[in-house]
């Protein structure tokens, strides 16, 4: 792999965004023990847009994504410095209630991880944990979120069946429905379609495009075609650095950084 000058970056600040900034980071650093895995990442995420995080394996994109709702807190000997700004609050502060913050910034993981419960209970579990007992409200949330996740028509007559009986693609859409049941502002997605077949992947992509009408979405993907199809903005990561951030169409046609050009053209990664 070529050596790149990591001091040269092209991070396009959204000084006049079409929509407000939903989430941003300022000089974000992540350390695993003595290893620095993320270097001074400063990015902005526009509300009601999909931003793709791309880069080779080990580039830091998933580390960065997990930082956005402090999932890295669960990893031993991990330290995060810098600011993560949400609603004018630095959610990287020790004073922030992490669990309450995650109600606003939800996450969907790479592999479907439904609970060993019914389809209905998968979606209502967190709501019930927060004290919601109104059956009518819970029923409405189940129907609404399953429709948003393009799953309602397939499961509306089997809501009491185990979620584990669903196909992989259906399970992932259930996990999306479960994530939005808490009505978050932001959805973080770590390669949500990488374990799915092409038809299921297409369905998930169509679902995400619809969901951005109501949610801000940040997605890690290794699939360049997927990033080009569904995202409005793209951030390119290399060796723990966010090197380039721009509108997706510009990133894929006129990248400013040599490393980004090599990656999107398939010369490495």
From Swiss-Prot:
Protein's name according to its UniProt entry: Phosphate import ATP-binding protein PstB 1
Keyword Nucleus included in the entry's annotation = no
User: What biological-process terms (Gene Ontology) are attached?
Assistant: phosphate ion transmembrane transport
Task: Name the keywords, alphabetized.
Answer: ATP-binding, Cell membrane, Membrane, Nucleotide-binding, Phosphate transport, Translocase, Transport
User: What is the membrane topology listed in the Swiss-Prot or TrEMBL record?
Assistant: Peripheral membrane protein
Instruction: Give the location in the cell.
Output: Cell membrane
Per the database record, which ranges form the ABC transporter domain?
A: 23-264
Can you tell me which family this protein belongs to?
A: Belongs to the ABC transporter superfamily. Phosphate importer (TC 3.A.1.7) family.
Q: Is S-adenosyl-L-methionine one of the keywords UniProt gives this record?
A: no
Description of how the protein assembles with itself and partners: The complex is composed of two ATP-binding proteins (PstB), two transmembrane proteins (PstC and PstA) and a solute-binding protein (PstS).
In short, the EC number is 7.3.2.1
- Residues engaged in binding ATP: 55-62
Describe the task this protein carries out: Part of the ABC transporter complex PstSACB involved in phosphate import. Responsible for energy coupling to the transport system.
- Signal peptide location: none
Q: Could you state one GO cellular component term attached to this entry?
A: plasma membrane
Recorded catalytic activity of this chain's protein: phosphate(out) + ATP + H2O = ADP + 2 phosphate(in) + H(+)
- InterPro entries listed in its UniProt record: AAA+_ATPase, ABC_transporter-like_ATP-bd, ABC_transporter-like_CS, P-loop_NTPase, PstB-like
One of the Pfam families matching this protein, by short name: ABC_tran
> What's a Gene Ontology MF term here?
ATP binding
Q: Which NCBIfam families match?
A: 3a0107s01c2
Q: What is its main location?
A: membrane
> Top EC class per UniProt?
translocase
- Which Gene3D superfamilies does the protein's record reference? P-loop containing nucleotide triphosphate hydrolases
